[in-house]
Amino acid sequence: RRRQRQMCIRDRTTVKVVTSFAPEALYRDATGKTMIVDPGAFTRPGGAYEDGAFGPEQILCSESNLYPILVAHKRDFYDKNRDYRRGSLFTDRALYVPEVLFSRGGDVRRADVLVIAEPIRAYALENHRSERECDKALADRIETIFRVAAANGAETLIMGAFGCGRNGYPVEQVIELIQNWIAEHPGAVPNVVFAVPRMHADAFREAFGAPEPERPAPVVVAEGENDREGDDEDWRNVELPEGVTLR
């Protein structure tokens, strides 16, 4: 399967849109010091990872040593978050984990991980939070992500469609906030890779430039090699709820 992607230049910021999961984007698309956004659970290390859940955070945990690190911060980070759920909007309080080890086929890579909760607009409105509060929470969260990446010298930032899908924010709103930040801070984060589900990929592609032309190339597959990417194809069309996962 050929992965569709695109690249555009925003002054000194290079933007790519891919439909792979974040760990794969780390190996295929990242350059230099990399920070990956983990849209993590606010009060539970790894979310429902131990229960076999399958979502962005659980994928990161399954391909790295991230999970035991999160568990070690249960008392000083997660437990203290319990009083600040804010009707499912949560706060900008984040956990920065440097040099997480990722392993794939014997190839070990390091990347910093920013654990920061997505505001859940759909639940917040049910909990009598206003539209204005919901919009501000998303804007503040995205601002925090990019500022943390820039402050820590990240050369590549990998993030998903933060706040979209089940969280209830329109993809256009998320994209506009990101575009504005990049336009106001050109080159502050040199490379941004959006590893997004297929259901949001077209919107990100439209916003961040035309796709690179596909050029057919011969592919040699070793006999008996598993077609892992083929297995992943349909999963990217599914908007998985937090706490429901395959492993």
Regions found by a protein language model. Name each.
Residues 1, 148-154, 170:
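Extended, basic/helix-rich recognition subdomains
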Residues 22-35, 39-152:
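Glycine-enriched loop-and-adjacent helix/strand subsegments that border the catalytic/binding cleft
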Residues 35, 155, 190:
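Short acidic/polar active-site loop segments enriched in Thr and Asp
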Residues 37, 156-166:
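Glycine-rich anion-binding loop/nest that anchors nucleotide
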Residues 108-111, 116-119, 136, 143, ...:
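Divalent-metal-activated hydrolytic enzyme cores
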